[in-house]
């Protein structure tokens, strides 16, 4: 009895194990199928990637070959440029040793001619604005060197001649420091200023120079150095040629000298030749007040706007008109207004030109008298005559009547629209409503449109 249940239980266990093994085999089989499907998908993607990467690899190889070819060409061009530079002398030869640079000076010589040219061009452009100052400084240093050398030579002379002046003047030569005017910069900048500014500058410059130069020590120097007066007076004032060169050609040298002499009657004539003895010093009060006034006048003259030739002529005419005080005042003013408005077409002139053109086209037509752009066009006959002058076969003008206004407007507008492609900017009803005095602007606008379309058929 006990063996039967054991056998039944063993059979049940074997059946359960069989079912479990079958389930495991099915799961493993499904897993193998999934792995095979995944492998096939991966293989397909790898094959597609290889298929796409093939042209890319070929392109990369071609680019590498092109790069090598370009490098070869670049090397060849470099050698050609170097040989060209050697033939033209723009660069030193590689085998020839360059001279050693000076001690303390860096070697900044460029290797190619283009770099040297660019550096020179940059230097010239950047230094152009400072050329005047450099020139002034160079001239000032040259004058100072000349005066210092002259003073040293006179100071170290073992003996002085009787004609050279008293020994007091010789001993006081190295003591004073001469002022440093810049006549070169003054003459260079004067042509850009008005004539009044030029006069004020020269007047102030001569006044201040005389006030500074004619001190007691300087007077002794000027009186003592009779053997070399040009060296003593040259650094102080510019020459008359330099002053006169800055003025316009309309002012002569004699006129400028007279003007300067008349305004500086109290100051010594420093423009005269240096052999003339200096005049006595004016009072100190006059010298104290006049430079300030002249400086204010100089600032006022320099702030004036630069006038052109036309503006100068206009100002001259206006001044002449004020001076005449009514003589020919109306005629001159009319001429000035006409000259000011010359070349500017006004609305009235355009209307007059268009009206003259309409008169020339409607000359000889009956019932047409063009005097304006209002009542002369009120009956429609002017429109019909203008269109008929360009298209005489379109209609019979002699059959029209000024009393039939609506018919005239309709005929003229229709023919202009059909034959000249001119749109109706005015309606017939509007012309009928406006009566015998239509709006001049409406009529002028439509006539201007007719002119633009009809002139093509002239």
UniProtKB/Swiss-Prot annotation:
User: Which sequence positions carry the modification called Phosphothreonine?
Assistant: 96, 272
Low complexity: bias regions: 158-167, 209-220, 245-254
| Positions of the UniProt region annotated as Disordered | 87-111, 123-142, 151-312
Record carries keyword Coiled coil: yes
Which stretches are tagged as biased composition: Basic and acidic residues? 131-142, 290-299
Database matches in Pfam families: CH
Any idea what this protein is called? Smoothelin-like protein 2
